[in-house]
């Protein structure tokens, strides 16, 4: 059993991509410290600055959501995929073994990414504007996107969040609640994970 783990995106050092087209900041993965061939689930934030192919991950289901910037075009013409990821906070899902090229639509963009190993976990990226309870599912993660949020005695702002895996029995944790009075509408990225099999359909055009 692990306690809820807090993180701050601004304190996580980015890992540059080998092709020089961007970088990734890992928020959490399970098991902790697992490599790209061994994780069961992984959540990260990536900055995409130049065109190039996505790395292929056989046996992994992926979800991606635009956080900031003009967005990117996801293209695999031999599979009939040509999708503009240009709407903030609207996640899309695709199979990790699809050969997808990524083309920036105008400058660098920042994206929220979820990877799930097939047969191990299932879940989805959501954007919530109401209270949620970190630790209420077998595993998961939440990250503040905008506004101010109260968690127990702590206040969280954009880029701050929590992740968990087998944290505690349901009902043992405080709710994460939006606070009013700010200029930005409160929003939080929410990933609730449960054991099971998930197979994403090919990315829609």
Regions found by a protein language model. Name each.
Residues 1-205:
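Jelly-roll (double-stranded beta-helix
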């Amino acid at each position: 059993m692990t306690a809820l783990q807090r993180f701050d995106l601004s304190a996580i050092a980015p890992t540059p991509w080998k092709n020089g087209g961007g970088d990734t900041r890992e928020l959490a993965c399970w098991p902790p410290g697992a490599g790209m061939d061994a994780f069961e689930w992984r959540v990260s934030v990536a900055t995409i600055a130049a065109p190039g192919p996505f790395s292929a991950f056989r046996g992994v289901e992926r979800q991606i959501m635009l956080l900031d910037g003009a967005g990117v075009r996801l293209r695999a013409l031999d599979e009939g995929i040509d999708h503009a990821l240009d709407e903030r906070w609207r996640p899309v899902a695709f199979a990790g073994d699809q050969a997808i090229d990524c083309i920036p639509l105008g400058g660098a963009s920042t994206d929220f990414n979820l990877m799930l190993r097939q047969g191990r976990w299932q879940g989805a990226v959501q954007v919530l504007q109401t209270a949620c309870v970190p630790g209420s599912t077998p595993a998961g993660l939440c990250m503040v996107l905008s506004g101010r949020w109260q968690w127990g005695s702590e206040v969280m702002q954009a880029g701050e969040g929590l992740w968990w895996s087998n944290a505690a029995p349901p009902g043992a944790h405080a709710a994460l609640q939006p606070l009013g009075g700010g200029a930005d509408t409160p929003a939080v990225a929410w990933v609730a994970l449960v054991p099971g099999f998930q197979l994403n359909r090919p990315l829609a055009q």
